[in-house]
Amino acid sequence: LARLVEDPSLIDSAVEEILRFTSPVIHFMRTAVADFEIGGKTIREGESVSLWYPSANRDEEVFDRPYEFDIGRNPNPHLAFGGYGPHFCIGAHLARTQLRAVFGQLLPILPKLEVAGDLVRMKNLHVGGYTALPVRAREGVALAS
């Protein structure tokens, strides 16, 4: 966080790392329309296949230090929005824009905030996120300028 506050030019790469590390989509299932082989395993037509995005976004063959949160990670070929192609999330650009806007506005006051309670995660097997992230101004700090 201190690095981002110190260098706001990292907002874009920080947004991508947040998406990789938190994987808003947990998993999707598909049905094979033909037999195929992947990783030495044969998948038969009609069988279900599931992609677990948090696992894919920590693939040690793709990411150096995959369990480390690094806002300077480059390249960052995460699959947070379903990868690429016809199943790519139509809201991906909006989500990225919203995250950039939020961080652009919060960066000046982030050092003045502290966590004020437990983070509450969504209870959902398909999408991830938080329903509550309570924060407050640090003692003796005024947020208004």
Model-predicted regions and their roles:
Residues 1-145:
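Cytochrome P450
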